[in-house]
Amino acid sequence: MAGRNYHGYGGGGGGGMSMVVASTPGQELALTNCAYVSSADIRRFPNALALVGDAFVFTLRAHDAVSAGSIALNAIQRRQTKVSAGDSITVSSFAPPDDFKLALLTLELEYTKARTNRNEELDAVVLAQQLRRRFLDQVMTSGQRVPFEFCGTNYIFTVNQALLDGQENSTPLDRGFLSSDTYIIFEAAPNSGIKVVNQKEAASSKLFKHKEFNLEKLGIGGLSAEFTDIFRRAFASRVFPPHVVNKLGIKHVKGILLYGPPGTGKTLMARQIGKLLNGNEPKIVNGPEVLSKFVGETEKNVRDLFADAENDQKTRGDQSDLHVIIFDEIDAICKSRGSTRDGTGVHDSIVNQLLTKIDGVEALNNVLLIGMTNRKDLLDEALLRPGRLEVHIEINLPDENGRLQILQIHTNKMKESSFLSPNVNLQELAARTKNYSGAELEGVVKSAVSYALNRQISMDDLTKPLDEESIKVTMDDFVNALHEITPAFGASTDDLERCRLRGMVDCGKAHRHLYERGMLLVEQVKVSKGSPLVTCLLEGPAGSGKSALAATVGIDSDFAYVKIISAETMIGFSESSKCAQICKVFEDAYKSQFGIIILDDIERLLEYVAIGPRFSNIISQTLLVLLKRVPPKGKNLLVIGTTSEVGFLESIGMCDVFSVTYHVPKLKKEDATKVLRHLNVFDEADIDAAAEALDDMPIKKLYTLVEMAAQGPSGGSAEAVYGGEEKIDINHFFSILSDIIRY
């Protein structure tokens, strides 16, 4: 047979010929889907198949009423090939390839003439048998419209899908022979009044515009698992015919709640779900838009959202289209009933109205609500139970593979346009952008592009012509962008560095041992499956280096999420506000696979005062609960606490909730010697004497004394001392030390 040269499915043989278009000789012949030529012309087509125009293949038959050089087409064929009677059209012999039989054919049915107020049921099994017999071995092409008669009524079917044997969904769907083994799926055209019954051959595909999902083309990156869950929970049952769902005895899911941190793609996913669906355009409600100053108007606005779905269900029943309603920032209008004190009760009425529409006495079965929020805790509980917004999908921060997909999506166009430099390594960027949300990654790309564009602009002469061809976004641009765009969630490096302004110095065996123990706990969090929560308490005298040690463990852990909770960031907060802030840090930590939380100076967080004694029981109970709370599945957390009042923590039972407690000691003479040698501000001969005086000294106090002594007797010597030009006078150092009464 001839080779494939038209869309991969065979082609014309012997070149095309121009023929004059005529009308089909008789009305009964118009329902055969064949084209008619003269007896002389049909000899030019060995397979009796012709490619008419450039899109459709018709079976040819000879007819005496057709003159030589003419081809007779019915009205629908002429309309689809865009010709009129008397026009000329190119006709080529079509040679089908091997394996040209259709495995699956999806047809959309409608009346030839639109009929009002008429509902008719068509048996899918009987209709499929007749169509196979009537159009056997004819070529069916996607988009083709074919008239036919069934039980005395004329109909038209449109080919929505034509799938060959062994053909994958990802390959182009075009045409093939209708055989006796071809599965046929029938779909009624919208508002046609036709109802297909006894449809058992395959799942319905009319729910979606596309036959497959390519999330990257939709601009969705890193959310394939979440999208799969949404499809399984909310759409899988809707793909099957209604009679299958009725036999299963289940109801469709009517609501999805997308929740998670800002910028992770909740709104994007809801918008793209709406674009995927056939039929009605989604209604998008931006939270407070439904509110009105008039009494009862707010509830009416909610009812109006469901009006189209109600009318559709009344007229079409189970065949009605799916109506999607998207609520952005749903927490603004669906707060827990009784939580707002505005005196009007309008927020409670909104929740009540939604509940009755979704799952009331006359509940609709053709609606799907998609709500989005980053405050799931504010929503009314009744709205979240099965039958309402029952599918809860957390849209979390993307992992490394997800970040790579997002970066590829946002750099795809510049790569196609050759604006992306070859030295840009997206894999490396994905690895370096831990805890970046999708919106922040988009911000990184925009920032990198701004650097590239700025290089082409002369600030001295803004009228200078721009050279578009020389625009290149380089790896350096992305590195600069990473410094400019920082993640809202992640390691608070600046806060951690403030805990060790002088770096981390080797202070001897005791401190080195504690650091190694801390890194062992980090490793335990990484690999352990049985202990997702590890807690550690560092106790010791004030200034002994507890905070610096905890911060160093956090920085060296290379965890994506490291946060420090200290009293200095909550000055002026009420007790309840402090509790809320502490809870928020823990909740954010649960969003990362590995996280570290440092509770710095726990006694200060608890507002402890020795006289009394006095402390905040609310904050104490909050910490006790959170330190025992196991993180969600797949999330591991290390909590490091520091305190100078271990006796107080023992008295309130706080020490018992920590897995291990380590004592951070003051410096001994040999430890002080190491630190002084590292600082290199004393003469070698004076180091031992200075270290002897610093025995049992907290390291923070040591640094303070050295800095005071470095000023010199009359001041102004610090720059020379730290520059290595001078050394601290040992006698002046002892003089400074003698002024310190207590350390």
Curated annotation (Swiss-Prot):
Record SUPFAM superfamilies: ADC-like, Cdc48 domain 2-like, P-loop containing nucleoside triphosphate hydrolases
Localization terms from the record: Cytoplasm
A biological-process GO annotation: Golgi to plasma membrane protein transport
Keyword terms, alphabetized: ATP-binding, Cytoplasm, ER-Golgi transport, Hydrolase, Magnesium, Metal-binding, Nucleotide-binding, Protein transport, Transport
Tissue specificity: Highly expressed in stems, inflorescences and immature seeds (at protein level). Expressed in leaves and mature seeds (at protein level).
Protein family membership: Belongs to the AAA ATPase family.
Further facts: Overexpression of NSF decreases plant height and grain weight, and alters the morphology of protein bodies.
The protein's assembly and partners: Homohexamer. Binds to SNARE-SNAP complexes to form 20S particles. Interacts with the 60S acidic ribosomal protein P0 (60SP0). Forms a complex with the heterologous pentameric complex formed by P0 and dimers of P1 and P2. Interacts with RBP-P and RAB5A.
Name of the protein this chain belongs to: Vesicle-fusing ATPase
Species whose genome carries this gene: Oryza sativa subsp. japonica (Rice)
